Regions:
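A short, polar/charged loop-to-alpha-helix boundary motif
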Residues: 129-141
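Extracytoplasmic/periplasmic proteins that interact with beta-lactams or build/remodel peptidoglycan
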Residues: 1-108, 276-277
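Extended, non-catalytic scaffold segments that flank or surround catalytic motifs
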Residues: 74, 135, 155-157
């Protein structure tokens, strides 16, 4: 039991004891009889509490064991996927660094030049290209762009963080503030949120020269708090790592959605040219306003190691 649960249990026990004593008094029992009865009563309560604690701890340990088994299965899957990656044309030094950075974590790594779309490595290609995942807080990039574009986020406006303080866009991105982006998403609205998600390449293939790329998925409809949460947690989105790489690249390069490409031969390498899928129909100042918060996340915020 947690401390809070234990305090609640003690309060409940005190109420029950008080009611039980009153019941014994109504029976006309003497103080000595009541004291003896209460010792027996409390002994039973202690056994019940210990049993509840034992069961709660057993359930907690079982949950930990299940999660460890899931994590171990995912790590094994990742290592198996990495062994099957197509490495032709990849930069071996970049790949080695990416594999080392991933370590024993269950994940994928995409290394891509945000100005040219040149891909240097994709570690765990099955997850990075062919399997969409809930984007979690990375969806805040879409919410931020939508909020600025729709004038929901003013140039110098701050928003309450749900407590005593107010926070601006830069710190909201840097610290991944859920309350801020939930408010923005709710004010932007579902249709506009989907418009900007499409504009930034979600829900469609990037065109990378690997087979069986996934297009991911975008939500069908959200309203109320579900809409707010979608803009902070990415509920019902499925996004691939390569989609996220092209989205982040578009923010940094001024709105160009590039076609990622890995040159696999000497000829492809020498003739490589940047291919722009499209230019996002978003004002250039919007991208510039996003960058300080993204940099802040790494330098001092939630992305800092």
């Amino acid at each position: 039991m947690s401390r809070q649960e234990l305090r609640a249990e003690r309060r409940r026990q005190a109420r029950e004891e008080s009611a039980y004593v009153a019941k014994l008094k109504r029976r006309g029992m003497s103080r000595r009889q009541i004291a003896a009865e209460m010792r027996h009563y409390r002994s039973g309560h202690r056994r019940a509490i210990e049993e509840a604690r034992r069961r709660a701890e057993a359930a907690r340990q079982a949950a930990i064991a299940r999660q460890r088994a899931i994590d171990e299965g995912l790590r094994n899957e990742v290592q198996s996927n990495i062994a099957k990656d197509e490495k032709t044309g990849e930069d071996p030094e970049v790949r080695r660094a990416a594999v080392d950075a991933l370590g024993t974590h269950a994940g994928t790594v995409v290394v891509m030049d945000p100005k040219t779309g040149r891909v240097y490595t994709v570690v765990n290609q099955d997850w990075g290209l062919r399997r969409g995942f809930k984007p979690c807080s990375t969806i805040k990039l879409v919410t931020g762009v939508a909020g600025i574009s729709e004038k929901v986020i003013a140039p110098v406006e701050t928003v309450s963080d749900g407590g005593r303080y107010r926070i601006d866009l830069t710190d909201a991105l840097a610290y991944s503030n859920n309350t801020y982006f939930q408010q923005v998403s709710g004010q932007v609205g579902f249709d506009k949120m989907m418009q900007y998600a499409h504009e930034m390449g979600l829900g469609e293939r990037t065109g990378i020269n690997y087979p069986n790329e996934s297009s991911g998925r975008i939500p069908l409809f959200k309203s109320g708090f579900a809409l707010n949460r979608m803009g902070s947690h990415g509920d019902d989105f499925e996004v691939t790592a390569i989609q996220l790489a092209t989205l982040v690249s578009a923010i940094s390069n001024g709105g160009k959605l590039l076609v990622p490409h890995l040159p696999r031969t000497v000829q492809e390498n020498s003739s490589f040219k940047t291919e722009v899928r499209r230019k996002a129909n978003i004002e250039s100042d919007v991208w510039k306003r996003m960058l300080p918060g993204m940099i802040g996340a790494v330098n001092y915020g939630s992305g800092r190691k």
